[in-house]
Amino acid sequence: MALLDSATLEFVRSHADEDVRRLAFLADRFPGVDMPAALDQIRGRQVAKVKIPAWAAVDGIVYPPHLSLEQCSGEAAARYKARLVRRLGVQSMVDLTGGMGVDFSWMAREVGQATYVERQEWLCALAKENFPRLGLSHVEVRQGEAEALLPALPVVDFIYLDPARRDSKGGKTYAISDCVPDVSQLKEELLRHARWILVKLSPMLDWHAAVEAMRCGLGGVCEVHVVSSGNECKELLLLLSADAPVAPRLYCVNDDVCFSCDTRCAFPPLVYGVPRVGDMLLVPNASVMKAGCFTAFASRFRLRAIAPNSHLFFIPAEEASGDGFATGMPARCFRLVAVTSFNKKALRQALAGVSRANVAVRNFPLTAAELRKRLRLGDGGDVFIFATTTSERQHVLLVCRKLPDAGKIHENQP
């Protein structure tokens, strides 16, 4: 891959925050500039400012085309993997699917010996250009296929893989066996080269099925990490080891909040009820929802559920020690200001003075849009309405206000 010449680099620096669509029409005015390459870099840096701001802050980073940026991890997810590497006490590592190198760049900072492997030559060239600028002078870059290079690689503490999830036609794939490389087939060879294997998979996968796919032969999954950012599920991570237990430990991560549980435990059944005014309503975050560990979640925080399929929980006012009780909770937390049936008089009283609201439905016969129209409410504002069905099959509206977020590591987070 040809790196940028000085004229193109200067153009990129001078126009870093401008609209690339407008800049594309200026090519004739800058004959000495490689305009397609310049636009790729400007667009790449603009994406990086949002997705990987620490990279965007470093002058001279060379960015790949849009698809590689789309597929790479965000900074929050990369930092999480680095914390995991630190917790495991890793001293040496290999990334067998280096790609743009975002995950590698954070994990490599935690170890004394790190090797980046990538099958595409141009991405290796980018890595060799970028890693020194990121302060990674102790890393090695190797070009080649993971399966071909693996037998010749030294034994290390930790191997990381982010298998390609696109088929030969560019379409997205999700199943482990459809990804390249197929980690389920490589697992035993990988575990002969490392104590720990971390695999990044699509958040669309069911984690139970992913664990089952890794169960045959030597080793298996010892930890499952469901990673979200901004309450949007981004990644499913499987940590494999040769001595994995029968059932893995589950980590549900959203930004700086982590909830974990042992999937071998039998938790008490959910206790159902209807909340009252003043109670705290909790909506599990995206990672808990994806993991489906509702009985563990409710048991840990002594929560009641509204119904089996609502995934709405509450804490009686007398058991919640003020708004600070929500600190570090793996959920969005609300204070109930009204609980009402669909009786017209009750609705008028509950919604008095409310002209706009954020409306959501859970286990309810109407869509949010249909309900908002029926209630004659605009969208938005600081009032939240959850329409749901109780365990006794009664339709209720829960009118509430959101409690302040207090992002904080709650427990056991790497």
Where are these regions (language model features)?
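SAM-dependent transferase fold signal centered on methyltransferase-like domains
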Residues: 1-414
